[in-house]
Amino acid sequence: MKNIQKNIKKLKQKITNISKKFKINTQKIKLLAVSKNRSVNDIKKAILCGQNSFGENYVQESQPKIKLFNNIEWHYIGQIQSNKAHIIAKNFSWCHTITNKKTAVLLNKYRPYSLPKLNTLIQINIRDNTINIDDDIETIKQLAKTINSLDNLNLRGIMAMPYFKNTYLEQIQSYKYIHLYFDILKKKYTYIDTVSLGTSHDIQAALYSGSTLLRIGSSIFDV
């Protein structure tokens, strides 16, 4: 309990310090605890420290945790398999990893009307600096249009999975397009508010690049 409590306190202070440096409103930053491969006991400790948003990568692993802690916010941040879409749609509040229209339609189909709309993010993969912005943004626009048309999905923004970079400057260079994509979408969908970007290894670069949601695992559970 003490380690997780200490880790969360230290992490929040780090976020505050970075936010002051870049003049970011900390109220707009969401901390998501990545709980894949973490025990129920570890999750319980984090909840007792005030953490109420958790991210899972694997559908099967997530189910016992969600059933046990059904009063907190669960985010699906893993790859979506078509045969698991119904489980994601029925059990999570957020899905970060929509990459195509087929997946969006399936999630919409299986989302119960008795639940609030499923908050959704369009996943963007930034691998290098040779991407074709015009081609990519057109694909993203078409996917956003599809999501926006579906009754049971709520488009909230984008999620980025950049290629891992070692240095801060390399991270900044890799992430520079991400908020550009978000800004382009926001011109049409003014209500979107989320850029899911950043892990334990790149918090400063992520916040500098406009992240509003940090996906943190090891800095909470391992240190």
Swiss-Prot record:
N6-(pyridoxal phosphate)lysine PTM sites in chain numbering: 36
Record keywords, A-Z: Pyridoxal phosphate
Entry's transmembrane regions: none
Coiled-coil portions: none
Subunit description: Monomer.
Family statement drawn from the similarity comment of this UniProt entry: Belongs to the pyridoxal phosphate-binding protein YggS/PROSC family.
Protein name listed in UniProt: Pyridoxal phosphate homeostasis protein
